[in-house]
Design a protein with these regions (language model features):
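Short beta-strand edge/turn micro-motifs at domain boundaries
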Residues: 125-147
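Bacterial Sec-dependent N-terminal signal peptides
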Residues: 1-28
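Short, low-complexity N-terminal intrinsically disordered segments enriched in polar/charged residues
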Residues: 19-54, 58
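Short solvent-exposed beta->alpha transition segments
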Residues: 57-91
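Surface-exposed, charged secondary-structure patches
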Residues: 81-119
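A mature extracytoplasmic/lumenal domain signature
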Residues: 60, 70, 101, 111-113, ...
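Sec/Tat-exported extracytoplasmic proteins
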Residues: 41, 48, 52, 60-64, ...
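Hydrophobic pocket/interface hotspot
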Residues: 44, 56-57, 64, 109, ...
Length: 147
């Protein structure tokens, strides 16, 4: 009787593990995600060019970080960077996604950026890593750091 009960429980457990997982809801189409992220990168660059630190800040998720900054420090940091870009004539940013991956909850973007002056000359280049998180159905910056 005990063997029969244990065997039945193990079969139910095995069946529920094998067939009870819903993998379709956890998948993210990386091709579609890449289009969305590249669009968000362009939007981010446009906000920077326009000097709109509030719109930049609003692209971040709750609990997000920019390097080691959080909350209002992110807003202050972008405000300072915008002022510097106006003084240095480096308001144009070009983002290029080089890699995009997912764990089904987050998108991890690796890329390069280039600051250009008003004549289109390259002034500064670098690399970045961004972790995107969905919040209220929209992808938001969750971790943002230069490499």
């Amino acid at each position: 009787m005990l063997k029969s009960t244990l065997l039945s429980l193990s079969l139910v457990f095995t069946f529920s593990i094998t067939y009870g997982q819903n993998t379709e809801s956890a998948t993210i189409d990386l091709q579609k995600a890449r289009i969305i992220i590249e669009s968000l990168d362009r939007q981010f660059a446009q906000h920077f060019y326009n000097g709109d630190s509030i719109s930049l800040y609003n692209m971040y998720a709750k609990g997000a970080s920019l390097e080691n900054k959080r909350g209002n420090e992110i807003l202050l940091s972008w405000g300072q960077q915008i002022r510097n870009s106006i003084r240095n004539d480096t308001r144009t940013i070009i983002y290029t996604t080089t890699s995009l991956s997912t764990d089904s909850e987050f998108l991890v973007e690796l890329g390069t950026y280039e600051f250009r002056d008003s004549k289109g000359n390259s002034k500064y280049k670098g690399k970045y890593l961004v972790v995107w998180k969905q919040e209220d159905g929209n992808w938001k910056l969750y971790r943002d750091m230069g490499l």
